[in-house]
Amino acid sequence: MAKTDTASFDSILVLDFGSQYNQLITRRIRDFGVYSELLPNTITAEEIKARHPKGIIFSGGPNSVYDDGAFRVDPEIFKLGLPILGICYGMQLMTYTLAGGKVESADNREYGKANIDVTSDSATLFKDTPAEQSVWMSHGDLVTQAPDGFDVVATSKNCPIAAIQDVDRKLYGIQFHAEVRNTDYGNDILRHFAFDVCQAEANWSMDDFIDMQIEKIRAEVGDKKVLLGLSGGVDSSVVGVLLHKAIGTQLTSIFVDHGLLRKGEADQVMASLEGKFGLNIIKVDAKDRFLSKLAGVSDPERKRKIIGNEFIQVFDEEATKLNGMEFLAQGTLYTDVIESGTSTAQTIKSHHNVGGLPEDMQFKLIEPLRTLFKDEARELGEKLGMPSDLVWRQPFPGPGLGIRVIGEITEDKLEIVRDSDFILRDEIKKAGLDREIWQYFTVLPGIKSVGVMGDGRTYDYTVGIRAVTSIDGMTADFARIPWDVLQKISVRIVNEVDHVNRIVYDVTSKPPSTIEWE
């Protein structure tokens, strides 16, 4: 029997202290089949107790425990008797809070790969892992004295206390980031915490998520009406099908053709969602309106905000025509939230689904995918019976091609990106790489260069190709596309797309870059 309340699952709570990786901790635990969610560090012991979790994880963070305004935790949490794992800042905070512990500024800061030595045969989290292993460090402070009752179980060259444990109280700390894939045995460490220490049961699944969200949506919406903004991407499409399953005709979807869509996208969206699933979709042609607002604007943040605001204004106008629309649904994902910044994390970039919303918005928000990563959203789509060609469409940002034209947006520039992106996707699919490469698209950097075509001099645009491999979009590496495939793509773009004479390939990972250029 499907579960419809989070209390029905064994869960591990992650407290947010500001690390850009904190969502990954939640994701890793969920990968084990254990429900997990990220909560503010201001949560009280009583609030945690009411949730009945199997354990707690303190995330990393940018603060020093000695900073004014540094994030703290309710000390009563340590009296709940629950297993706690502190990661990086989380370990330092645990040490700072408990008696006998000491944290100091490091003489030699560690950022990146480091080797640790596991010094105890009874190190619970390191069971069945090598005595020497590579981990991912990112810290300027370190623990110089473990709290009373703790044993030091791992060290590194620049960090004499790299891991600690108090088995009796089920308290554990690691100075490195087990959630990052650069830590060789990170999954093993987190798995030992979830199952050996917390004794959690793997009873969480996507089927449960669907049932839980449907019940939650019905309870929140009641008999009211919901307006959904379809962007043409995977996320909003999945939200549309999920909402339709939950509330049927109470959902009206607005598909705004803002002139920033990919080639043939508008027709594909209408055919897939209106035709197959029966969604009630109103298509709005707002191309001239959006391009007029964006004229002369080069700053990427301004472009995002303008596009977000225009979307809401269009929705407001359509809602007025429809009468009684109280809710606005969006396809916001976990990665959107973290990159837009939380109360603890710095903003990397504002997302259309998060940062572009005006303060006087007339709708109540519904974001059913807010706790999911991209691949989880795809899994959800498949579980809902959506066709694979729709579920596996390339990720597409809310602002569309507006952030793939670097600088000022014009119709001519959009056409270059639209046509070149179509060629890229076509050749990647022909090569059988469309499921191997996580995301791929073209971008117009706004650079012109000299070329020779037809024995004549040209001075035309450069098109950039961005292709990455990833699991969840939080970290990514550039895809190693075979040279012959890249050559075909390059030749076709230069020959078939007007005003282009040069192709470049982005070979940067995330971090330091983001996947999108803007």
From Swiss-Prot:
Its EC number is 6.3.5.2. ATP binds at S231, G232, G233, V234, D235, S236, S237. Residues 204-393 form the GMPS ATP-PPase domain. Pathway: Purine metabolism; GMP biosynthesis; GMP from XMP (L-Gln route): step 1/1. The active site is at C88, H177, E179. One of its GO terms (cellular component) is cytosol. It catalyses: XMP + L-glutamine + ATP + H2O = GMP + L-glutamate + AMP + diphosphate + 2 H(+). Residues 11-203 form the Glutamine amidotransferase type-1 domain. Keywords: ATP-binding, Glutamine amidotransferase, GMP biosynthesis, Ligase, Nucleotide-binding, Purine biosynthesis. PANTHER family: GMP SYNTHASE [GLUTAMINE-HYDROLYZING], GMP SYNTHASE-RELATED. This is GMP synthase [glutamine-hydrolyzing]. It comes from Lactiplantibacillus plantarum (strain ATCC BAA-793 / NCIMB 8826 / WCFS1) (Lactobacillus plantarum).
